Amino acid sequence: MSPVRPRYFTPREVSRHCVLSDLWVSYLGRVYDLTPLLEQHKGDVLLKPIIAAGGRDISHWFNPKTGDVKTHIDPQTGCLKYYTPQGRFLHIAPCFPCSGWDNDFGRPWWKDTIYQVGILSSKTRFIRIINTLTSQEQMLEVCSEETIWEILQRYLAYNAHAASYTWKFCGVPLDMDKTLQENGVQDEDLEFEELKIDADLYTPSIHLYFNDDLTEL
């Protein structure tokens, strides 16, 4: 059995999870749901920087080579310390020796994969999906790494029978197991930006043709 493919998220999706009861962050290309961590340590003042960062990318907190929190030489002690200008947070030791510091927590939360829910897209793009049966159009922001089948899963919110359609671009059926780029749907955002052309005026259109098989999902 092939391994389950991780889910990709857009920064916009991550940003929607920014409250105490539902708090996500992204860092170093991964997306994490820290809600269980907040519940476990409810009321701990060291959660404040984490809560303040809810829904955002915090890659700047970490060293991309080690995956650990950035360090610096403390000017007062001359010792190597974690660098936390946003404020000391959970599982970060105090700057000075402290008898009340409990370091028996095992793996620090930022190294615990139990909180990981997916991968942050390195590049998102907009596409227009046109239902030729109903003439309805839907603009979707998708991840460039997603296959057409995964994009279909996003579109189910607008059409529960999306799998009953043949998906085409410029009249050619799309390979549902390939990405947009692999299907020849080029991402020209960079070229448009260099030419100062509004990319929204040239959003790729995917046309759906009904197969009349009444697929139930």
Swiss-Prot record:
User: In its UniProt entry, what is this protein called?
Assistant: Cytochrome b5 domain-containing protein 1
Origin superkingdom? Eukaryota
A GO molecular function for this record?
A: metal ion binding
Mind listing the UniProt keywords for this protein, alphabetically?
Cell projection, Cytoplasm, Cytoskeleton, Heme, Iron, Metal-binding
Q: Does the keyword DNA-binding apply?
A: no
Which Gene3D superfamilies does UniProt cross-reference here?
Answer: Cytochrome b5-like heme/steroid binding domain
Q: Cytochrome b5 heme-binding domain spans which residues? A: 6-72
PANTHER family reported for this sequence: CYTOCHROME B5 DOMAIN-CONTAINING PROTEIN 1
List the SMART domains hit by this protein, alphabetically: Cyt-b5
Recorded hits in PROSITE patterns, A to Z, give: CYTOCHROME_B5_2 (PS50255)
Metal-binding among the record's keywords?
Answer: yes
Provide the GO biological process annotations.
cilium movement; regulation of cilium beat frequency
Q: Which subcellular locations apply to this protein?
A: Cytoplasm, Cytoskeleton, Cilium axoneme
Binding of heme occurs at 41, 72
What is the name of the gene encoding this protein? Answer: cyb5d1
Its annotated function is as follows: Radial spoke stalk protein that binds heme under oxidizing conditions. Required for the coordinated beating of multiple cilia maybe by functioning in a redox signaling pathway.
What protein family is recorded? Belongs to the cytochrome b5 family.
Q: List the record's Gene Ontology CC terms alphabetically.
A: cell projection; cytoplasm; cytoskeleton
What is the species listed in this Swiss-Prot or TrEMBL entry? Xenopus laevis
